[in-house]
């Protein structure tokens, strides 16, 4: 609890407040903003026809039961409502009540008589446009109402009491026959449309020209067969039990699925396309298998002098002895001049090797 709230109030509290308020200087803000808030002497307040007095109530409401009314004739002094006076522009107030022009009764009676004498077309010229709008609206409303009534009457005539008599057996059969014909026609049309649709669906599109098909699949992996080992009983003893006999059956344990591998196939529609993409080169020349003329075996060597193939050393000696006998009887061949002095051999032809100049010696 604060000290100020607990102590007793002073008797002289607020004595100097009135003096401070009188000595306070007026602020310029309230004198200049919006034209100032001070009242002018020449500004008359607006006074309406009705006095700004509070509602009069019965005197019994404000008087307690124990109090006696001081005087019934005294009336409360009306209090005027003060408003803030500014120098801003104000629109002139218009009187709510129209002014009554004091006209003599004779003139008004004469005007009424003149108006009655005028034709209807010339009366109320100022309100002609308004009356024309009213008349067009009323005419349009009347036409709309007539149309609605006509529609309702037509609907009533249509929905009137219409009693359909039951059809006879002959009429029912005739109607069923007509319905059957219509159903058959509809069924034929439907079947024809379905057949056309199936033809269009199953019609395969053919691509002109060569076709290369790429197809990749998975196939079971097949291992290459290796050398098969056989157990040979050398000493005549019983063979040792195989590993398959010692191990239990594979059916008791889990069986692993066989391994698989991928294979890719490329198919060509014709051989011409295949040869175009994979041209084949010239096949290699297969060497001619030469035979030794002495032993009639495949020749493994060739004599450089006689250019005769031979298979063994004995065949080589026989070939040389025959060559010596030939030289003794016929002399050296043309190619043998290269071994001794003599005229130079002729120039070889283009494309021919040294073997082309050698003379073939046939041993019979």
From Swiss-Prot:
Q: What does this protein do?
A: Deposition-and-exchange histone chaperone specific for H2AZ1, specifically chaperones H2AZ1 and deposits it into nucleosomes. As component of the SRCAP complex, mediates the ATP-dependent exchange of histone H2AZ1/H2B dimers for nucleosomal H2A/H2B, leading to transcriptional regulation of selected genes by chromatin remodeling.
Per the similarity annotation, which family is this? Belongs to the VPS72/YL1 family.
Q: Where is the composition biased (Pro residues)?
A: 341-351
The PTM Phosphoserine maps to 127, 129
| Record's subunit section | Component of the NuA4 histone acetyltransferase complex which contains the catalytic subunit KAT5/TIP60 and the subunits EP400, TRRAP/PAF400, BRD8/SMAP, EPC1, DMAP1/DNMAP1, RUVBL1/TIP49, RUVBL2, ING3, actin, ACTL6A/BAF53A, MORF4L1/MRG15, MORF4L2/MRGX, MRGBP, YEATS4/GAS41 and VPS72/YL1. Component of a NuA4-related complex which contains EP400, TRRAP/PAF400, SRCAP, BRD8/SMAP, EPC1, DMAP1/DNMAP1, RUVBL1/TIP49, RUVBL2, actin, ACTL6A/BAF53A, VPS72 and YEATS4/GAS41. Also part of a multiprotein complex which contains SRCAP and which binds to H2AZ1/H2AZ.
| Entries under InterPro entries matching the protein | Vps72/YL1_C (IPR013272), YL1_N (IPR046757)
What does the record give as the DNA-binding region? 156-206
Q: What is this protein called?
A: Vacuolar protein sorting-associated protein 72 homolog
Molecular-function annotations in GO:
DNA binding; histone binding; histone chaperone activity
Q: Which PANTHER family match?
A: VACUOLAR PROTEIN SORTING-ASSOCIATED PROTEIN 72 HOMOLOG, YL-1 PROTEIN TRANSCRIPTION FACTOR-LIKE 1
Primary localisation category: nucleus
Q: Which domain of life is it from?
A: Eukaryota
Changes after translation: Phosphorylation is enhanced by ZNHIT1 and promotes the interaction of VPS72 with histone H2AZ1.
Q: Where in the cell is it found?
A: Nucleus
Give the compositionally biased regions (Basic and acidic residues).
Answer: 127-142
């Amino acid at each position: 609890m604060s000290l100020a709230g607990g102590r007793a109030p002073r008797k002289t509290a607020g004595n100097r407040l009135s003096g401070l308020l009188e000595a306070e200087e007026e602020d310029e803000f309230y004198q200049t903003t919006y034209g100032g808030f001070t009242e002018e002497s020449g500004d008359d307040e607006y006074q309406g026809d009705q006095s700004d007095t509070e509602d009069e109530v019965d005197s019994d409401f404000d008087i307690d039961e124990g109090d006696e009314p001081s005087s019934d004739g005294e009336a409360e002094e009306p209090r005027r409502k003060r408003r803030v006076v500014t120098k801003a522009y104000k629109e002139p107030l218009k009187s709510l009540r129209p002014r009554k022009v004091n006209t003599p009764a004779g003139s008004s009676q004469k005007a009424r008589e003149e108006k009655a004498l005028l034709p209807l077309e010339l009366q109320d010229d100022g309100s002609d446009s308004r009356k024309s709008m009213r008349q067009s609206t009323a005419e349009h409303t009347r036409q709309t109402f007539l149309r609605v009534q006509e529609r309702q009457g037509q609907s009533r005539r249509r929905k009137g009491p219409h009693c359909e008599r039951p059809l006879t057996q002959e009429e029912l059969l005739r109607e069923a026959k007509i319905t059957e014909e219509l159903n058959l026609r509809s069924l034929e049309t439907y079947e024809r449309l379905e057949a056309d649709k199936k033809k269009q669906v199953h019609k395969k599109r053919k691509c002109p020209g060569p076709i290369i098909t790429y197809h990749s699949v998975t196939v079971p992996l097949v291992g290459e067969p290796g050398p098969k080992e056989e157990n040979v009983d050398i000493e005549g003893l019983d063979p040792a039990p195989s590993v398959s006999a010692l191990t239990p059956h594979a059916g008791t344990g889990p069986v692993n699925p066989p391994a698989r591998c991928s294979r890719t196939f490329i198919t060509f529609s014709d051989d011409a396309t295949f040869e175009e993409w994979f041209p084949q080169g010239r096949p290699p020349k297969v060497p001619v298998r030469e035979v030794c003329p002495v032993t009639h075996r495949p020749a493994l060597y060739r004599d450089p002098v006689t250019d005769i193939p031979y298979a063994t050393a004995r065949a080589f000696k026989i070939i040389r002895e025959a060559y010596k006998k030939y030289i003794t009887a016929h002399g050296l061949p043309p190619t043998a001049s290269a071994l001794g002095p003599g005229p130079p051999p002729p120039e070889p032809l283009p494309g021919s090797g040294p073997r082309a100049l050698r003379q073939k010696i046939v041993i019979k």
